[in-house]
């Protein structure tokens, strides 16, 4: 992890926009691979990906996952295999206070409907908000 942190620091110094994100790869209930780009957060214990518990990806993270990062500014990539675990509720509550208003509104929406659920139209989404 020390080398990862040093390389990520170098990518941040180079203002690499990819230093803030990673690709999380999982396998869905049908055995199909799923990959999505997420913000990669630093926490004292290591790294964190914030995943809404109502999202299908939360269930998928309960097994083995793969994380891929690519920092073009320093020509370095990492492929990491890991297991995920939930962060303490206190940590999540503190972090949530730092979020911008729009993501907070989206969190409220996810309490009404599961994340990644189909929305029939933009108007329907705006009506929910």
Task: Give the positions of each predicted feature.
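Binding-site signature for planar aromatic cofactors or substrates
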Residues: 1-129
